[in-house]
From Swiss-Prot:
Primary role: Essential for the assembly of the photosystem I (PSI) complex. May act as a chaperone-like factor to guide the assembly of the PSI subunits.
Gene responsible for this protein: ycf3
Localisation: Plastid, Chloroplast thylakoid membrane
Cellular compartments per GO CC: chloroplast thylakoid membrane
Alphabetized UniProt keyword annotations: Chloroplast, Membrane, Photosynthesis, Plastid, Repeat, Thylakoid, TPR repeat
Name of the protein in question: Photosystem I assembly protein Ycf3
TPR repeats (start-end): 35-68, 72-105, 120-153
SUPFAM superfamilies reported for this sequence: TPR-like (SSF48452)
Species for this entry: Lotus japonicus (Lotus corniculatus var. japonicus)
Protein family according to the UniProt entry: Belongs to the Ycf3 family.
Lineage of the organism: Eukaryota, Viridiplantae, Streptophyta, Embryophyta, Tracheophyta
Amino acid sequence: MPRSRINGNFIDKTFSVVANILLQIIPTTSGEKEAFTYYRDGMSAQSEGNYAEALQNYYEAMRLEVDPYDRSYILYNIGLIHTSNGEHTKALEYYFRALERNPFLPQAFNNMAVICHYRGEQAIRQGDSEIAESWFDQAAEYWKQAIALTPGNYIEAQNWLKITRRFE
């Protein structure tokens, strides 16, 4: 049974109903419909913390989806799961792949910055200030890109950039 039929969450149910209606009225191929079904089921599983199931659905959606823009969101969500699992190298890889297909994903730049900042803090705890500065500089570059795409967002990042004199 498709995940959308067994999910008890009202918002997920509403999304599923609207998505099903759109799939019926918007002219799409059967492959596009199937890809979206896997994507939707992946989002549902991810929202419940069922990451293994979500990844299976996202990988199937990637196999079927041909549109680069749509693929960017699938890749982004895979990155989110790897971030949640503490697999930062894999997460960065998927965020990069998402941005290759859609360079207007400020949330991907933000998440990459957060990972780099975290790695900078780890380097400080290990006593390696040179490596830490390198990670912080990389975080700053990603945050600048996120802020450039959505100037009113990422206020904490903007403050950090100003405090650390990395904001131009």
